[in-house]
A protein has these predicted regions:
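Short hydrophobic beta-strand element within catalytic cores of glycosyltransferases
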Residues: 224-227
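Nucleotide-activated donor-binding/catalytic signature segment of Leloir-type glycosyltransferases, i.e.
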Residues: 160-186
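Conserved donor-binding/catalytic core segment of Leloir-type glycosyltransferases
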Residues: 111-128, 133-136, 146-147
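Donor nucleotide-sugar binding/catalytic pocket of nucleotide-sugar-dependent glycosyltransferases
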Residues: 71-85, 90-107
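A charged, aromatic-enriched C-terminal amphipathic alpha-helix characteristic of glycosyltransferases
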Residues: 5-9, 248-251, 255, 269-306
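N-terminal pre-catalytic "stem/leader" segment of glycosyltransferase-like enzymes
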Residues: 1-38
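Active-site proximal beta-strand in glycosyltransferases
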Residues: 26-56, 71-75, 96-98
């Protein structure tokens, strides 16, 4: 299986929603500079989805002579751009921000008082699976359960073979907890199809995201989200989630997440909360849909092409 993470999903959507004739004028490389040789007959763009501190790209950016190799740099969040600007002094006149987006906005389900509260955790395991499992050990309300789809398989079989053993103790812990169901890897299509079966996305993130497709999908489906203010999450998620302060003490974070999750049962069914979730979904339909993002990409690419001619 080839990698099908957030970056690969965004590339597929770009190719789906932006005119292929326009795209053919460009070579767009994602995240890791020069993993594809620079094209001599096209405009070279580096579409940056990774964090500034990743070891597979940091050495390249530290050498300022490399910066001239790409005609443009596209960043997936203002947070991501700011980090590269501050750390590597990237050429700001050749940088722009175009955020990630989705095209799945299912009909939102209304939660009623007394209904079971089902939660979903579908990011990779190093993005806080240990913290949410710690929280679930503290939650005693039998009406609250968590389905875990976390896996390294999302980045392909080779990546899984090299890295999955590290997280098998967490998978085993998830399988043993009474209020947790370990589901393992499922395709993004499956997640999007079934995401409204859940009411909450508790994203106990302790990995600096530059954006977050899982968050956008959950918020765009009208799920209530509890997350940290780490990395770019406060930008991607805006004012819609309940935020748990990021803490280097993961035991404290687990306790805070447990408290936040336990509190949900008191308000999730309230009209005011349901109105909030409807406004949230409307917000993501308006600002994070590919119908909007395709216009941003088209305008940007046409502008670059016109300036080149």
């Amino acid at each position: 299986m080839n990698p099908i993470g957030g970056t690969e999903l965004q590339v597929k959507l770009l190719e789906k929603y932006v005119d292929s004739k326009l795209l053919n004028n460009f070579q767009i490389t994602t995240s890791v500079p020069e993993k594809i040789p620079l094209a001599k007959d096209k405009i070279n763009i580096l579409w940056q989805q990774n964090s500034y501190d990743q070891p597979n790209l940091a050495p390249w950016f530290k050498d300022k002579d490399n910066h001239k190799k790409y005609d443009w740099y596209v960043f997936n969040s203002h947070w991501c751009y700011e980090k590269f600007r501050m750390v590597y002094k990237v050429p700001t006149e050749r940088c722009t921000v175009i955020k990630n987006a989705i095209d799945n906005f299912p009909e939102r389900k209304i939660h009623k008082k007394g209904d079971p509260i089902r939660m979903i955790f579908h990011p990779t395991p190093w993005r806080g699976l240990n913290i949410i499992l710690g929280a679930m050990q503290l939650i005693k309300n039998e009406n609250i359960t968590l389905d875990v789809f976390s896996s390294t398989k999302i980045y392909g079989n080779e990546f899984m073979d090299n890295n999955d053993d590290t997280y098998k103790p967490l998978y085993a812990q998830a399988a043993e907890l009474k209020n947790v169901n370990y589901r393992g890897w499922h395709s993004n299509d499956y997640i999007c199809k079934h995401i409204t079966d859940y009411q909450i996305f508790p994203y106990s993130n302790n990995w600096e995201e530059t954006s977050c497709i899982s968050a956008i999908e959950a918020l765009g489906a009208g799920l209530h989200m509890i997350t940290t203010n780490y990395g770019a999450l406060f930008e991607t998620c805006s004012e819609w989630p309940v935020y748990v302060q990021y803490d280097t003490n993961y035991k404290n974070m687990s306790e805070c997440f447990a408290y936040a999750i336990d509190s949900v049962i008191d308000y999730l069914h309230h009209d005011r909360c349901q109105e909030h979730l409807q406004m949230q979904q409307d917000f993501y339909k308006k600002f994070y849909s590919w119908s909007k993002r395709s216009l941003e990409w088209t305008n940007f690419l046409e502008g670059v092409l016109n300036a080149k001619s």
